[in-house]
Amino acid sequence: MSQVFNFSAGPAMIFPEVLQKAQGELTNWLNQGVSVMEVSHRGKYFMELIAQAEKDLREVYNIPDNYRVLFLQGGARGQFAAIPMNLIGKKGRALYLNSGHWSATAAKEARNFAEIDEITIVENGEQTRITDLDFSHIADQYDYVHYCPNETISGVEIFDVPNVGDAVLVADMSSNILSRQIDISKFGVIYAGAQKNLGPAGITLVIIRDDLIGNARKETPSIWNYATQRDADSMINTPPTFAWYLCSLVFKHLKEIGGLEVITKRNALKAQTLYDYIDSSKLYRNVVAKENRSTMNVTFITGNPELDAKFVAESTSVGLQALKGHKVLGGMRASIYNAMPQEGVEALISFMKKFEAENLPQ
């Protein structure tokens, strides 16, 4: 088989340099004669690792000093519950902006804990697009406003930050965290599962403004209580140390290659190259409006489910893995997160051209 490129939506590709580093010291971390998986999470060396990981992340993402960084577990789904348990206060309700599957799922979970209002901000006509993002006239009625800036299933991304006035803005950035620089100060909470751009599954990143910590409802489990986790250095329980270690290597690698300035340019080039080919093709079609096309998850169809299935099977056989679209929409999806090189996109386009030449209806 030729070189394999992994287009999985998550768990996703990890930088080869990171995997090689981990492989090289897997059984002898820091010349201790043991693996990082075997050392105490409260030992000197691991405590130094997590301190450096946070320092590197803060530098790469330009996180202000009045924000706390937590490394938790439970994935984004865990945060779907943790957010309302920690942030619902005197107003007693929150606003959820529905742009697709994951934002709707977050709202559904939050309803177990609070009164939730939901506004659909996506139009699914001939093209899928995001509607108006100005909620400053109503946001002060809510304890927070929640949205998902990148919907992996539909391939829809929201590039502008919603206007919520002085209200607390919460963002599920699981699929576009660290893909470009953002102004952290516009958000009250940012959370993300690790398995797309941060590292392997098992770690959940939470970036939260200091003043939002300490208001959890009394029945909040300690594992979901942000104040408890802050005071315990994100280690109220034994954390997934190997996943944390790999995330630390990713943060360090991002610094070494030039940070998010470089990553932003790389990601824009990858996405534009692929979308330009799709738009020029007579076989493939993307149904998302250009201004809302995801940089991370590129969806496309042939219009024939049988041909889509053939595409997935044949692409897999030549080392282009995990291109099958989500079961909700079908078709194909190329997830091109930070670790995907431009060469992977070029290899995909080369296959797409060959497949089109062989299968375009005459």
Give residue spans per PLM region.
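Conserved PLP-binding catalytic core of the aspartate aminotransferase-like
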Residues: Y284-S315
